[in-house]
């Protein structure tokens, strides 16, 4: 019975990672501005998660000090997603997701600073290898430089909010803090759109197919994927989760090629550079797991 539950959780994790990969494809298929897309995503996802908490009859009250921190993290999430979708729209899904493998490199730099731990030599070495993989991609895909830079900035901000969340997640329920973060990000983007005078009739006048894609993005790819991933992480080891989530760029790039088509076809050096980055990230996880296993 326990073996069946493990297999079910493992397959569910792959499904969640598949959904995360599909998020990038939706970003390319939804034909509205990046900030507008994030506004819809955070607003609807926040409502769905809030409804889920009400259904569970769970309190959402938090200390004011924690709320202030969550609001700041929510701003970071909004900025992260805005530049994620901006990168997709000025380049493509393949470029954007390949850059997201740089997350572990940024984490190896930022984590020692935020958590005040020593820098590990092999993380620096792997970071240099990842930069080499990135250099190969940039040499042959220089026409996508703007998208590469947007994606790298998005990854950097994403690592920042993940590390901050790493501290908050131990203090409060993960779904509750996400609701606060989503609505804070929604408010932040709302202010930006108001200042930029984007809220007009055309903003809400979208074709039915676009509304459908937005709802899929907010419900399945955001609210559901988040709550399901939290449940899965309770049953699987962090190592298994980490290795599996590294497949997100692979799933996303394959989905983009089959759904969007030739625009997602890249040169051979791009795939070589992407494989170097992905393999290094996975090797980093394997070594970390072995070192952790040797600790008393």
Where are these regions (language model features)?
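Glycine-/small-residue-enriched transmembrane alpha-helix faces in small-molecule transporters
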Residues: 1-39, 75, 79, 83, ...
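Transmembrane alpha-helical segments that form core, pore/gating elements
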Residues: 17, 25-28, 49, 107-108, ...
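Transmembrane alpha-helices of multi-pass small-molecule transport proteins
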Residues: 32-79, 104-107, 157-164, 179-197, ...
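Helix-helix packing/entry segments at the starts of transmembrane helices
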Residues: 40, 97-102, 165-186, 222-258
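C-terminal-most transmembrane helix of multi-pass membrane proteins
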Residues: 42, 210, 246-296
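Hydrophobic transmembrane alpha-helices of multi-pass small-molecule transport proteins
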Residues: 49, 71, 119-138, 189, ...
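C-terminal transmembrane-helix exit sites in multi-pass transporters
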Residues: 53-56, 103-125, 250-271
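Specific transmembrane alpha-helical segments of multi-pass solute transporters/efflux pumps
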Residues: 56-94, 100, 136, 218-236
């Amino acid at each position: 019975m326990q073996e069946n539950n493990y297999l079910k959780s493992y397959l569910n994790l792959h499904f969640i990672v598949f959904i995360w990969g599909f998020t990038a494809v939706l970003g390319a298929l939804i034909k509205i501005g990046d900030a507008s897309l994030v506004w819809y995503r955070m607003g609807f996802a926040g409502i769905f998660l809030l409804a889920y908490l009400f259904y569970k009859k769970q309190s959402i009250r938090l200390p004011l000090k924690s709320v202030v921190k969550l609001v700041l993290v929510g701003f970071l999430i909004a900025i992260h997603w805005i530049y994620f979708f901006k990168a997709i729209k000025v380049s493509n899904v393949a470029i954007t997701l390949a850059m997201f493998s740089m997350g572990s490199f940024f984490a190896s730099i930022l984590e020692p600073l935020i958590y005040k731990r020593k820098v590990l030599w092999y993380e620096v070495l792997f970071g240099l290898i990842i930069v080499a993989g990135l250099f190969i991609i940039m040499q042959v895909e220089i026409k996508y430089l703007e998208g590469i830079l947007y994606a790298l900035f998005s990854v950097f901000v994403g690592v920042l909010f993940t590390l901050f969340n790493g501290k908050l997640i131990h203090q409060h329920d993960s779904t509750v803090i996400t609701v606060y973060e989503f609505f804070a990000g929604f408010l932040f983007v709302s202010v930006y759109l108001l200042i930029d005078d984007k809220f007009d009739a055309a903003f809400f006048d979208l074709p039915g197919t676009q509304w459908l894609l937005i709802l899929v993005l907010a419900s399945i790819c955001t609210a559901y994927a988040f709550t399901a991933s939290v449940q899965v992480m309770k049953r699987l080891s962090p190592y298994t989760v980490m290795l599996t989530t590294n497949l997100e760029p692979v799933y996303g790039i394959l989905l983009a090629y089959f759904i969007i088509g030739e625009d997602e076809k890249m040169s051979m050096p791009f795939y070589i550079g992407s494989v170097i980055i992905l393999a290094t990230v996975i090797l980093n996880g394997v070594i970390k797991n072995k070192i952790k296993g040797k600790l008393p």
